[in-house]
Amino acid sequence: MGRKYFGTDGVRGKVGETPITPEFVMRLGYAAGKVLVSDRGSLPANEHPTVLIGKDTRISGYMLEAALEAGFTAAGVNVLMTGPMPTPAVAYLTRALRLQAGVVISASHNPFEDNGIKFFSASGQKLPDSVEEAIEAALDQPLATVAARQLGRARRIEDAAARYIEFCKSTFPNRLDLRGMRIVVDCAHGATYHVAPHVLHELGAEVVAIGNEPNGFNINEACGATHTPALADAVRAHHADIGISLDGDGDRLMMADAHGRIYDGDQLVYVIARHRLETGYMKGGVVGTLMTNLGTEHALARIHVPFERAKVGDRYVLKRLHANGWFLGGETSGHILCLDKHTTGDGIVSSLQVLRALRETGKTLDAFTADLETYPQVMINVPVVKGFRLSDAAAVTVAVADAESALNGSGRIVLRASGTEPLIRVMVEGRDGDLVRRTAEMIADAVRAAAAASDIAV
């Protein structure tokens, strides 16, 4: 079944444009509420289902929170609200408080003009496609408020941050601490601004926090996991031992060593995998995505760690991990899954797994990744209008075939449509950086020409 509103990470768009309007989001809350009411599971008949709503620091979050609250309560669902809270915190709290669902108002790494809604199940995992499709189907039904006695109640919970801070600390061994380490943490002026520094401080680190002054408009602005020069500069300026960079909703992680060198999701997953292998608690293999650097795959093979690729999106990485019974996976962008620690990607928890590796071995990030060669990789995002399909572009198919011939087995080409934005992503990687760059530009030109020829403007 095709999905009209849900992408790879929930519903997302420009604030004030469908679907991110108060009217639509209220209907979305109502539709999700009706699905929850109809699928009560073991919930007693006289109890209302309860959902948890968290949000990042965008100014529009307050408006959308009120709309969701109205929709859910109109459907007879109780609502708990946390205020600004990282996405993985909502996943954890939904599970810990035994609620029926969690909802996050966030557009992750996007600028403040965007926002989105994503859902977690009672187990703290992203909803399966079938449930999202049921919610979409319910959106077509009229909004009919339940009888007054059946209306849901809404209230704020005050101890959400403290609960989550303790959870994060519990994923770090009791016998270790971070005393003697100076750590820069970039919170992207986002949802982790009030929890990430506390977690690190309470574990003993000397913390230098940047990107921790949200004003509703500066989330992800020249900071955070999608703009790592800010972290690198701060690490060097403060003579820190290490740096941690999170994105606006706290589910992505990048790190920097003492020299300001940045380590992406591929490299950090490798650090965790290698440490777990060396200490005897690596179970199974690693799941990456179509975008995971080929050098990471080769490095894992050299230490005899199995590796699989999933479609882009942490939900698909999670699906393959469950299918294999493995625990560790992630994306180049910094979504890292450590399923023995959490049910979803968590930037803070993942950073603690890397810090554990460094503390237990005395190694640096550079030493851990010395045998990991990251191959040159070029990504070009080609804007397109909705409706452009690569499958209809014969000229692009020919260009890719020519490019593969030029690479002669020494690299990879990936073309895919973004799940959250109207873009075609062209990725080429290989050992020869110049050849990789020329190849990516050739394919991107072919995509632009094909889009223009089909009268779907770029």
Curated annotation (Swiss-Prot):
Activated by phosphorylation. InterPro entries: A-D-PHexomutase_a/b/a-I, A-D-PHexomutase_a/b/a-I/II/III, A-D-PHexomutase_a/b/a-II, A-D-PHexomutase_a/b/a-III, A-D-PHexomutase_C, A-D-PHexomutase_C_sf, A-D-PHexomutase_CS, Alpha-D-phosphohexomutase_SF. Mg(2+) binds at S108, D247, D249, D251. Keywords: Isomerase, Magnesium, Metal-binding, Phosphoprotein. Pfam families: PGM_PMM_I, PGM_PMM_II, PGM_PMM_III, PGM_PMM_IV. GO terms for cellular component: cytosol. It is an enzyme of class 5 (isomerase). Its EC number is 5.4.2.10. The active site is at S108 (phosphoserine intermediate). It comes from the Bacteria. Signal peptide: none annotated. Binds 1 Mg(2+) ion per subunit. Its cofactor is Mg(2+). It catalyses: alpha-D-glucosamine 1-phosphate = D-glucosamine 6-phosphate. PANTHER family: PHOSPHOGLUCOMUTASE (ALPHA-D-GLUCOSE-1,6-BISPHOSPHATE-DEPENDENT), PHOSPHOHEXOSE MUTASE. Belongs to the phosphohexose mutase family. Catalyzes the conversion of glucosamine-6-phosphate to glucosamine-1-phosphate. This is Phosphoglucosamine mutase. It comes from Thiobacillus denitrificans (strain ATCC 25259 / T1).
